[in-house]
């Protein structure tokens, strides 16, 4: 039995079956390329759901990890550590926000944001206790915790996990009139993904984010942008909200903030919002740990120094252009910004992902019928052309 089959069998035997991965084992990775135990080489076009914007094992990020691991890895927040302040200052500069609150995973950052906007509603907006409402969108994906699952509109994420947390309203994504109608004096925030990733790379109609910002401002409602998957250059801008020159009241960040090396997430907002927390009101033993902070600083430096945001914009435009050349009636729509692209089919997408895997290209279906392409932003034009050739080979139909 091959090493790959041994690992898959072992994983399936002892692990809970909460994922349905493609049948490949990755044992080595560098840049945009990964290898299986048998030495076969694959181009990664998923980037761990956009956590690998800087590529696998970027040498500067790995060096930052090694250097910090030789000094101190964890202090808890019972003490200061010498990496946290620099991380705060750099992320504050990137977001333009006055305060940062660090966590580890994206879902933790979302939970942090929910707690922050609720307490802001009570302490600042003076909403009656336990009456705060938060508006979210259909098709949302903000994580897997019970509270976040409570406002999911996907039955597969909710089945068997009730009772659910109250206090949320769901409106159609991109519907400004629905947002206006959903707001009441008790509304604390409107939280959304500026581009919905898990829903299939869904982009709201142009102007929606700007209109939403204006509606929120007029009603003293916080606009919260979940940039966990879209942030740090993925869409060809630092944040997807930048496409409409919208600066939300709060950013939620994760994934690529850790450079594909270490889990670190954060919420960024101004003091009026994050000052609602006092010692003991929220925390995380590992949040803001020196190892994660050192890695995140290096990850942000790599994005800036290597011009990866602009690279995403340029390579993404080229990629979209080439995908639109594919002649096949099963292609329903191609959507995307930067290197965040969804190719929606009229049939199941997984068989095509499996065919691409056999040709050495790794991608994954989302919402059954959409193939998500999100390669590391460091991808070269040569490697992108290599990928395009294989995508055309699998999807192209000659007349």
From Swiss-Prot:
Biological role stated in the UniProt entry: Catalyzes the interconversion of ornithine to glutamate semialdehyde.
Modified residues (N6-(pyridoxal phosphate)lysine): 255
HAMAP family: Ornith_aminotrans_3
Enzyme Commission number: 2.6.1.13
Co-factor requirement: pyridoxal 5'-phosphate
NCBIfam families: Orn_aminotrans (TIGR01885), PRK04073.1 (NF003145)
Lineage: Bacteria, Bacillati, Bacillota, Bacilli, Bacillales
Protein's UniProt keywords contain Iron: no
Subcellular location: Cytoplasm
Pfam families on file: Aminotran_3
Gene name for this UniProt entry: rocD
Catalysed conversion reaction: a 2-oxocarboxylate + L-ornithine = L-glutamate 5-semialdehyde + an L-alpha-amino acid
GO MF terms held by the record: identical protein binding; ornithine aminotransferase activity; pyridoxal phosphate binding
Flavoprotein is among the record's keywords: no
Pathway field: Amino-acid biosynthesis; L-proline biosynthesis; L-glutamate 5-semialdehyde from L-ornithine: step 1/1
GO CC list: cytoplasm
Entry keyword set: Amino-acid biosynthesis, Aminotransferase, Cytoplasm, Proline biosynthesis, Pyridoxal phosphate, Transferase
Domain of life assignment: Bacteria
Protein name, as recorded: Ornithine aminotransferase
Family, per entry: Belongs to the class-III pyridoxal-phosphate-dependent aminotransferase family. OAT subfamily.
Coiled-coil stretches: none
């Amino acid at each position: 039995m091959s090493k790959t089959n041994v690992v898959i069998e072992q994983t399936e035997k002892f692990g809970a079956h909460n994922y349905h991965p493609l049948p490949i084992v990755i044992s080595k990775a560098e840049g945009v390329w990964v290898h299986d135990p048998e030495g076969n080489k694959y181009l990664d076009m998923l980037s761990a759901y956009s956590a690998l914007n800087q590529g696998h094992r970027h040498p500067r990020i790995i060096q930052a990890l090694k250097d910090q691991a030789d000094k101190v890895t964890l202090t808890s927040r019972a003490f200061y550590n010498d990496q946290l302040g620099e991380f705060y200052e750099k992320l504050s500069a990137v977001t333009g926000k006055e305060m940062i609150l660090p966590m580890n995973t994206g879902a933790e950052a979302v939970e942090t944001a929910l707690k922050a906007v609720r307490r802001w509603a009570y302490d600042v907006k003076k909403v009656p206790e336990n009456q705060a409402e938060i508006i979210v969108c259909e098709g949302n994906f903000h994580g897997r915790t019970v509270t976040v699952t409570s406002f999911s509109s996907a039955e597969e994420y909710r089945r068997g996990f009730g009772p659910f947390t109250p206090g949320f309203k769901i409106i159609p994504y991109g519907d400004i009139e629905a947002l206006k109608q959903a707001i009441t004096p008790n509304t604390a925030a409107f939280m959304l993904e500026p581009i919905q990733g898990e829903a299939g790379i869904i982009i709201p109609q142009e102007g929606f984010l700007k209109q939403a910002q204006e509606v929120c401002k007029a009603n003293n409602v916080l606009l919260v942008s979940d940039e966990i998957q879209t942030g740090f250059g993925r869409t060809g801008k630092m944040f997807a909200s930048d496409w409409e020159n919208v600066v939300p009241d709060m950013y939620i960040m994760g994934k690529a903030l850790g450079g594909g090396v270490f889990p670190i997430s954060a919420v960024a907002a101004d003091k009026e919002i994050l000052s609602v927390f006092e010692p003991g009101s929220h925390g995380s033993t590992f949040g803001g740990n020196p190892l994660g902070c050192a890695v995140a600083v290096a990850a942000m430096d790599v994005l800036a120094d290597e011009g990866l945001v602009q690279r995403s914009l340029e390579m993404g435009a080229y990629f979209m252009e080439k995908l639109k050349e594919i002649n096949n009636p099963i292609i329903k729509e191609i959507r995307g910004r930067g290197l965040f692209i969804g190719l929606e089919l009229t049939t199941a997408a997984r068989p095509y992902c499996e065919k691409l895997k056999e040709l050495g290209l790794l991608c994954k279906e989302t919402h059954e019928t959409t193939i998500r392409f999100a390669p590391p932003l460091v991808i070269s034009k040569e490697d992108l052309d290599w990928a395009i050739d294989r995508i055309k080979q699998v999807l192209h139909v000659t007349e």
